[in-house]
Amino acid sequence: MLYSSLRSSLLANIPHSNRFVIALSGGLDSRVLLHLMGRFIQENPQYQCDAVHVHHGLSVNADKWAQQCLQWAFEEKITCHIEHVTLVLGNRISVEQQAREQRYLALSKHVQQGDCLLTAQHADDQLETFLLALKRGSGPAGLASMPESTTFGISYHLRPLLQVTRQSITDYGIAHQLEWVEDESNQDQRYDRNFLRHQITPLLHQRWPGIRKAVSRSAALCGEQEALLNELLASHLSKALHVDQSLKIVELGSERIGKQLIRQWLSLFTVLMPSQAQLQQIWQSVVLAQDDANPQVCWDNHQIRRYKQRLYVVKQWADISLFQQKCELNQACSLPEGLGTLVLTTVKANGILRLPQQHEIVSVRFEPEGIEAKPQGRIGKRKLKKLFQEYEVPSWNRRRTPLVFYNDRLAAVAGLFVTEDFFGEDCDLDWLCNS
């Protein structure tokens, strides 16, 4: 019964994939999925299958679990890869959210174009997800919960056990004498999902035995409504989207349509969707702001900013205004906070900077406050703030643009200009930025 359900889901949803990647935690659900896929691959040798175990390091048993997953995958003739991730405890992002984000990031390293990621969520997980969305006051997108099949970057993500109950999976594991790991954190009812699992859903099942199917139908209907809305607004979003992925404010239309377009736009990025209150704040404080204002709304380590009548999604970076790094000729200088590297390279001709003299130390900094500069070919000096405006550098990037100094004199602003006193043909300045 369980195998038949999995096989039908695989063949119905992924007709063009020939490689599967199992997210293998080692718990009951993924352990059963591994066993089922072992049989599927044996009966269908035209398909390939790997497994990935993500080692979070949160439990003293984590190393043991990883070894067990390797052994179980070996028994099924499936190659298993171990991915180690590090979580930051005590920050604003919950351990649950961090673990989920890091887990999918680790899994993505093993899923290539056209592959299919398999995860073992089941009908009881769907019920919990729906209840958590209700608790948050989610709209149709959140209440749609987990789709059986969706995209995963340039590949696919399938949950082939989503219509199966937890009890059916347990019965299968026992019947086939499978072993699995028991994560002690699953008993910790400080986590919302565990509280629901142990305290709430048993009562719901007792009162309404058909609640899993009812919730599954409601989630599917919400998903259909959200998909329909996105389809109807797709051409509107395309018109509002700038080539740099910013959003043109003038194309947003009414508040009702505009806020939905902002949600669709944000779905293009790897950010947590803002709450209704945050979305309202984005509309009131950023979209409707005066043209000369510099508004921002922060959430989930990101910001919504406005510049030149367009909206931007900007990551919240640490302050690097005090950063100062000495640079050597022809050696890459590492920059902080995802800004990549900067290298001053000697060339025979057609460079942009003169060579530093013997007594001149080359350094890179980021604090533009109070600095004046005269770009090569310009008349008169101007404050860097004014020059950044002329060069149309958004305000949030002005303290993230490398300033190259010879001793304590500004020689160049990476990517923009060289100052008059330091112009020459001896060196090139290359900024390879990651962000």
From Swiss-Prot:
Subcellular localization, as worded in the UniProt entry: Cytoplasm
Swiss-Prot/TrEMBL GO biological process terms: tRNA modification
Pfam entry (one): TilS
Annotated S-S bridges: none
E.C. designation(s): 6.3.4.19
Superkingdom: Bacteria
Coiled-coil boundaries: none
GO cellular component terms listed in the entry, alphabetical order: cytoplasm
Keywords associated with the record: ATP-binding, Cytoplasm, Ligase, Nucleotide-binding, tRNA processing
Catalytic activity: cytidine(34) in tRNA(Ile2) + L-lysine + ATP = lysidine(34) in tRNA(Ile2) + AMP + diphosphate + H(+)
A molecular function GO annotation: ATP binding
Binding site for ATP: 25-30
Sequence similarity: Belongs to the tRNA(Ile)-lysidine synthase family.
Comment block on domains: The N-terminal region contains the highly conserved SGGXDS motif, predicted to be a P-loop motif involved in ATP binding.
Role played: Ligates lysine onto the cytidine present at position 34 of the AUA codon-specific tRNA(Ile) that contains the anticodon CAU, in an ATP-dependent manner. Cytidine is converted to lysidine, thus changing the amino acid specificity of the tRNA from methionine to isoleucine.
Name of the protein in its database record: tRNA(Ile)-lysidine synthase
Organism: Photobacterium profundum (strain SS9)
Record gene name: tilS
